């Protein structure tokens, strides 16, 4: 961790680092460091105005309306579109600005034109020759049939295709696609069969690459091969120019073929063009050869490319509105990563769909770019391509027939090529769901949806609740050889990825049924390789993401058909589920086959693993895969808030049913039930002067947000109450006009009420109570509650001030805001968060993981308020950035890290409109106030619908969290995301180990103060350890109720020495305090000033200086009995490397204390065996540190 800077320039740098990387879409086209010389600005000379004609000036401004030009037709149309199409002018301006940034600069277009001219000239100079002259590897990893191949010079000129041709190139790195057509004489009549066509394409590409490398103009360029859309039958040549321009632009060369070489009818879906003999398989001649519809579409892609490109050019060329509309759609699609890989929904499909809508008169030639994008989303959301759509005016074959061979059917202009041949139905439905969400966001006038639609990047893995990875080569071979049908192998030309995808998705979809919304492949783009190396084998692994249905995913029972009603169905059910299926009788009297996965009373964390249990069973039952053969990622981080095994639940004296393997989420209902019982008992108290109107719990546990497992272990020790956690409860009494008008008297009366409540609880309910400074402590069933009384008059008295003229004024201040927040606003927010957890059961566990992560990174409540974490997670669950709300806390935590890593803290206001209590006007006013008065709001701005006039300033302050802390958390979140993403997308790794995420880095700290372990209780959560110290002896001693002495001391250190040092510690059982010194300028000598002498020492005549060693002594004094020793992180590392344990506090040899009575000496003559002095724990002499 870098030093925390105080100066404003460093703070601005941290804020700049926290901006979302979704701006990369425009990074390339707006960069100035791109290898080109920027044109110099030419300033026009200013025209001198005559200064003596004052009458002319008067006449000029006498009738200003006479000099105003009337609006043009374009301006009138723009105003009308703004009113009719956009729900806010801000959204329109944001779209307009983004489109301006995405425009291709002339220098790039000029470079592309010049390169194409040079390449065309070079192609015409190519000489015919045999393949023997090619010195490069052929980019095709197949067993090739031996045939002679002669390179012939292309007869057609190279052409731009794709985005470069229709003017929709998109950064951050521009990829220009160029097509080079092979001569017709290169092919023979039978080349359409058995992959000969693909092999000739690859040979031709290798020859072209070899000839290009020999050209002086291309000698310095970087040559590499890659696969188009992860298709091993579609190698392309990637050329990256030398110099800085290569960072922003690259070119891809496609080899295509003329349409006339084969009849397109040879490639209809029901024809076979890959014979079984090609793979050495035998086939019964009496049987019909299996269809190879996907391989046929692969060949048709090349044969129909020119004609499809011509259709796209007719629609997009010269029509800026369609080009900009497609750019908007491409940004939207790329941010969701649904366009990646063999199974991706490519931008080419979007372009073709715009043409289809125009043909069907759903888009007009004069439609604006926004209308184009909105119409596409609206039509996609309500579309059904499974029945087939077509661009061909006269379709040669019926769509219903063609659609039967594909998941999704979208025929091209020829009527033979299915543009969506490789698109799985699940990916198509996911795109439709995203389009529907985009339309809903655009229709919601209460939010500015621009950021959610275009700017916020949401990688596909952040949408998955569970992930299945099959990466073992032996496992893949087993699946391909034993379980994949031969016709599937021929159809995909033995490409492993689509075969595995079809095999697994069909099985899992049948087994999971309504438990899942979707099963999507998670792909990464293939990496390029140099032209002198062999083509890599890709697709030998599979990663599937499961989006679960919260209503059905955690059902404990799968019920089959009744045996007496459907014997065949029952037999099939038994066969499918195997030994898991049993005949069961239900309460309604029915007797059916059923599979039970868990008990109804199981903890929520166990029920969330039901889908994992089902998937692993299906893989073992049908595919003979053991659990060790696959990586199933689900619930790996649940251990973070589970109960540590060091604490034995059996030792608790309680009547509650507790298991040793429990967690914070599972024990929370027990706490809430106890609270509800206490609330009922309080309502039954009859002898109070005023009735109790409402009782509200405000501690995090009442909203399922307490990461520490709260066990019933609070107790009385010598008439003093000891508890690890105190549960705060706010009580509001009925109205009365007899409350005093003086603050001290009112609080005294409140104390009297609490005494009366405690007395009646003891007499009527037999509960132990104890009065303290903050309220009334009540012990019930092993839990300690702190009761506070709330009265609106107290807030008014705190605001009351006397002016100089004796007039009473009511002014907000810190004390009044805190009372108003804790007594009136927090109960409502707590109730809203509790309701949010009831509707989204993942909210609570997500907060638990998030709080544990911040704590293990040594970010305590003094640096980052815990309520801020809860509200940020609630914001994630409230905003509709994704079609489906996650049901996995692990995924919710990843989305929380995304929010921390890519939020622009300087400009983003987090609004939580609970129950839609805020009107549109209120939201608009708050956003306007936030933008116009940004400096008056804290660095992290959170606002709820219950904040009243304090919106945006109630839950955080300027110092908590500060801008440096926000920058630090942003960097930590980005690093954690890198670890998670690299493990999830790795072909060989499973999920990241919790220890990699939940142990802070020991780098960057200057000093570490080790604290006495027996005075600091350990956390009840699963402890992953410290970055500085080894595990110490466990200590689960309960402190006095409501006392956290270490937190108070750290607060004192920060308030006194924050100008010179920053303090960090883990509030969940940390045994050390890490210190970072401020910059050296803070410790430089400075002139003597009376008001600036804190922590200063005289250093020379008239000057003073802050000395670090003196500050360390002050730290020791404040820590008192907690201090054990101080050292640097480097010293701790050396100790751990040398395995020489230092003299620890609990290893000290105890010496006889003169105050204690000495044991009697044994008489002489007695023989005793010599015994070694055993090391034993030396307890603190001053246990008052716990009080």
From Swiss-Prot:
Keywords: Chromosome, Nucleus, RNA-binding. It is found in: Nucleus, Nucleolus; Chromosome. Its main location: nucleus. Residues 1-20 have a biased composition (Basic and acidic residues). It comes from the Eukaryota. Gene3D superfamilies: 1.10.1410.10, 3.30.70.3030. One of its GO terms (molecular function) is RNA binding. GO terms for biological process: ribosomal small subunit biogenesis; rRNA processing; tRNA export from nucleus. Pfam families: Nrap, Nrap_D2, Nrap_D3, Nrap_D4, Nrap_D5, Nrap_D6. InterPro entries: NOL6/Upt22, Nrap_D1, Nrap_D2, Nrap_D3, Nrap_D4, Nrap_D5, Nrap_D6. Residues 1-64, 1134-1187 are annotated as: Disordered. GO terms for cellular component: condensed nuclear chromosome; CURI complex; small-subunit processome; UTP-C complex. PANTHER family: NUCLEOLAR PROTEIN 6 (PTHR17972:SF0), NUCLEOLAR RNA-ASSOCIATED PROTEIN (PTHR17972). Part of the small subunit (SSU) processome, composed of more than 70 proteins and the RNA chaperone small nucleolar RNA (snoRNA) U3. Part of the small subunit (SSU) processome, first precursor of the small eukaryotic ribosomal subunit. During the assembly of the SSU processome in the nucleolus, many ribosome biogenesis factors, an RNA chaperone and ribosomal proteins associate with the nascent pre-rRNA and work in concert to generate RNA folding, modifications, rearrangements and cleavage as well as targeted degradation of pre-ribosomal RNA by the RNA exosome. Belongs to the NRAP family. This is Nucleolar protein 6.
């Amino acid at each position: 961790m870098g030093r925390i800077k105080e100066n404003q320039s460093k703070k601005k740098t941290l804020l700049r680092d926290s901006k979302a990387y979704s701006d990369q879409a425009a990074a390339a086209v707006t960069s100035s460091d791109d290898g080109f010389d920027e044109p110099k600005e030419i300033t026009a000379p200013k025209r001198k105005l005559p200064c003596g004609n004052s009458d002319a000036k008067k006449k000029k401004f006498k009738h200003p309306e006479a000099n105003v030009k009337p609006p043009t037709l374009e301006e009138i149309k723009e105003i009308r579109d703004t009113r009719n199409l956009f729900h806010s002018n801000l959204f329109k301006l944001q779209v307009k600005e983004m489109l301006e940034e995405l425009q291709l600069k002339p220098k790039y277009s000029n470079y592309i034109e010049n390169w194409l001219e040079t390449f065309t000239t070079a192609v015409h100079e190519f000489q015919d020759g045999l393949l023997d002259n090619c010195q490069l590897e052929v980019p095709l990893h197949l067993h090739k049939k031996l045939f002679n191949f002669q390179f012939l010079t292309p007869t057609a000129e190279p052409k731009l295709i794709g985005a470069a041709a229709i003017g929709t190139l998109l950064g951050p790195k521009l990829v220009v696609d160029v097509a080079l057509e092979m001569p017709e004489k290169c092919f023979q009549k039978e080349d359409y069969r058995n992959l000969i066509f693909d092999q000739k394409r690859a040979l031709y590409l290798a020859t072209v690459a070899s000839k290009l490398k020999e050209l002086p103009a291309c000698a310095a360029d970087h040559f590499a091969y890659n696969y188009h859309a992860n298709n091993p039958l579609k190698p392309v040549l990637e050329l990256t120019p030398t110099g800085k321009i290569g960072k922003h632009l690259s070119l891809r060369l496609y080899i295509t073929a003329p349409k006339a070489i084969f009849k397109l009818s040879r490639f209809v879906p029901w024809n076979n063009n890959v014979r079984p003999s090609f793979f050495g398989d035998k086939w019964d001649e009496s049987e019909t050869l299996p269809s190879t519809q996907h391989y046929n579409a692969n060949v048709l892609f090349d044969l129909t490319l020119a004609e499809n490109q011509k259709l796209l050019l007719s629609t997009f060329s010269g029509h800026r509105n369609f080009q900009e509309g497609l750019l908007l759609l491409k940004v939207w699609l790329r941010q969701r990563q649904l366009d990646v890989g063999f199974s991706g929904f490519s931008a080419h499909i979007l372009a073709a769909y715009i043409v289809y809508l125009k043909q069907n008169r759903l888009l007009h030639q004069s439609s604006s770019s926004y209308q184009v994008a909105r119409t596409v989303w609206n039509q996609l959301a309500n579309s059904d391509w499974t029945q087939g759509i077509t661009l061909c005016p006269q379709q040669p074959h019926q769509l219903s027939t063609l659609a039967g061979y594909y998941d999704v059917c979208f025929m091209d202009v020829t009527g033979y090529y299915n543009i969506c041949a490789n698109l799985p139905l699940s990916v198509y439905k996911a795109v439709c769901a995203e389009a529907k969400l985009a339309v809903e966001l655009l229709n919601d006038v209460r939010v500015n949806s621009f950021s959610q639609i275009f700017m916020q990047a949401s990688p596909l893995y952040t949408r998955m609740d569970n992930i299945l990875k099959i990466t073992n080569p032996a496992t893949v071979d087993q699946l391909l050889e034993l379980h994949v049908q031969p016709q599937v192998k021929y159809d995909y030309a033995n490409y492993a990825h689509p075969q595995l995808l079809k095999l697994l998705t069909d099985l899992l979809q049948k087994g999971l049924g309504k438990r899942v919304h979707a099963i999507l492949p998670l792909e990464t783009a293939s990496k390029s390789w140099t032209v002198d190396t062999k083509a890599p084998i890709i697709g030998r692994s599979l990663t599937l993401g499961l989006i679960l249905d919260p209503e059905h995913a955690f059902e404990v029972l799968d019920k089959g058909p009744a045996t007496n009603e459907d014997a065949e169905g029952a037999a099939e059910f038994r066969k499918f589920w195997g030994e898991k299926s049993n005949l069961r009788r239900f309460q309604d009297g029915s007797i059916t086959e059923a599979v039970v996965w868990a008990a109804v009373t199981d903890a929520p964390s166990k029920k969330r693993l039901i889908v994992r249990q089902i998937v692993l069973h299906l893989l073992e039952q049908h595919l003979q895969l053991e659990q060790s053969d696959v990586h199933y990622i689900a619930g790996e981080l649940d251990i973070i808030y589970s109960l540590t095994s060091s604490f034995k639940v059996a030792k608790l004296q309680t009547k509650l049913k507790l298991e040793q393997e429990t967690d914070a989420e599972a024990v929370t209902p027990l706490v809430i039930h106890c609270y509800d019982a206490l609330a009922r008992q309080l309502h039954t108290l009859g002898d109070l002067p005023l009735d109790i109107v409402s009782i509200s719990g405000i501690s995090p546990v009442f909203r399922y947000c307490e990461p520490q497992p709260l066990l019933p272990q609070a107790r009385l020790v010598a008439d003093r109450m000891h508890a690890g956690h105190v549960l705060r409860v706010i009580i509001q009494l009925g109205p009365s006009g007899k409350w005093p008008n003086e603050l001290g008297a009112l609080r005294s009366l409140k104390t009297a009420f609490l005494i009366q409540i405690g007395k009646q609880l003891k007499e009527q309910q037999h509960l132990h109570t104890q009065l303290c400074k903050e309220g009334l402590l009540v012990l019930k069933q092993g839990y300690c509650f702190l009761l506070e009384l709330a009265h609106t008059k107290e807030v008014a008295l705190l605001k009351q001030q006397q002016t100089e003229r004796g007039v009473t004024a009511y002014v907000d201040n810190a004390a009044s805001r805190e009372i108003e927040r804790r007594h009136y606003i927090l109960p409502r927010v707590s109730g809203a968060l509790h309701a949010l957890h009831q509707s989204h059961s993942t909210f609570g566990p997500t907060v638990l993981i998030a709080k544990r992560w911040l704590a293990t990174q040594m970010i305590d409540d003094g640096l980052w308020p815990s309520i801020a974490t809860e509200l940020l997670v609630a914001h994630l669950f409230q905003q509709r950035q994704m079609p489906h709300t996650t049901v996995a806390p692990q995924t919710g935590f990843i989305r929380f890290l995304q929010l921390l890593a890519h939020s622009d803290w300087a400009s983003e206001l987090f609004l939580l409109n609970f129950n839609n209590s805020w009107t549109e006007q209120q939201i608009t006013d708050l956003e306007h106030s936030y933008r116009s008065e940004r400096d008056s709001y804290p660095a992290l701005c959170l606002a709820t619908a219950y904040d009243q006039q304090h919106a945006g300033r109630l839950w955080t302050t300027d110092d908590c969290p500060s801008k440096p802390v926000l920058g630090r958390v942003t960097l930590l979140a980005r690093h954690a995301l890198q670890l998670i993403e690299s493990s999830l997308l790795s072909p060989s790794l499973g999920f990241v180990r919790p220890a990699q995420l939940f142990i802070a880095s020991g780098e960057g700290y200057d000093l570490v103060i080790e604290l006495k372990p027996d005075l600091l209780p350990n956390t009840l959560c699963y402890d992953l350890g410290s970055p500085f110290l080894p595990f110490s002896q466990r200590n689960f001693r309960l402190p006095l109720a409501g006392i956290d002495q270490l937190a108070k001391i750290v607060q004192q250190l920060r308030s006194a020495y924050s100008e010179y040092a920053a303090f960090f510690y883990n509030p969940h059982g940390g045994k050390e305090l890490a210190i970072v010194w401020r910059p050296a300028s803070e410790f430089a000598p400075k002139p003597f000033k009376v008001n600036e002498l804190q922590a200063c020492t005289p250093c020379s005549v008239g000057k003073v200086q802050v000395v670090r060693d003196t500050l360390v002594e002050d730290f020791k004094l404040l820590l008192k009995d907690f201090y054990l020793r101080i050292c640097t992180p480097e010293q701790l590392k050396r100790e751990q490397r040398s395995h020489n344990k230092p003299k620890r506090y609990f290893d000290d040899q105890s010496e006889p204390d003169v105050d204690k009575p000495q044991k009697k000496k044994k008489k002489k003559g007695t023989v005793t065996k010599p015994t070694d002095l055993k090391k034993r724990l030396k307890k603190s002499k001053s246990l008052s540190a716990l009080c």
